[in-house]
């Protein structure tokens, strides 16, 4: 019975993540999309503004990284622009809120979520094996992800007991 509940939860997580990814992929403008030179050039100033605002927020170490990510998500949503890292921040914020609303996370336990990076790309890993990549419009199992075999680095993560980490090993006590 527990296995069935776990499988149902994973399917609910994937469904929720897919809704979020579809929204972001369709509404948040990027400027680094392959084979879209004209659109990229048009949206570049707005994306640059969004990245600049997020960089200002992220450099403010007086507040926790979690707070900084949530503030960036607000800017990204307001400006409706951002490349893969900004889109991942927005997906993180929306997914975290939805997991709480859908009662998949509560005050004592949380579905683990990590903002991951590889060389020049960012995406989420949810519950250790579900990938949510708004820039690539992908939600699925880690084993099926195009970057599955690349070395990943955790930028920020929330564990099942709500502890927060930066860079996989550094406990972020402020978050």
Each predicted region: which residue ranges?
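A structural boundary/capping signal
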Residues: 1-175
């Amino acid at each position: 019975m527990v296995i069935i509940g776990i499988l149902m939860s994973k399917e609910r997580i994937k469904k929720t993540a897919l809704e979020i990814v579809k929204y972001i992929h369709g509404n948040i403008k990027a400027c680094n999309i392959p084979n879209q030179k004209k659109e990229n050039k048009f949206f570049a100033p707005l994306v640059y503004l969004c990245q600049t605002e997020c960089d200002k927020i992220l450099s403010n170490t007086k507040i926790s990284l979690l707070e900084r990510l949530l503030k960036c998500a607000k800017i990204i949503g307001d400006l409706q622009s951002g490349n893969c890292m900004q889109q991942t921040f927005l997906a993180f914020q929306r997914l975290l809120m939805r997991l709480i609303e859908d009662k998949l996370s509560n005050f004592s336990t949380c579905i683990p979520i990590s903002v991951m990076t590889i060389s020049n790309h960012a995406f989420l890993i949810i519950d250790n094996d579900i990938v949510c990549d708004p820039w690539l419009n992908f939600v699925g199992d880690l084993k099926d992800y195009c970057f599955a075999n690349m070395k990943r680095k955790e930028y920020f993560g929330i564990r099942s007991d709500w502890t927060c980490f930066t860079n996989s090993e550094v406990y972020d006590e402020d978050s």
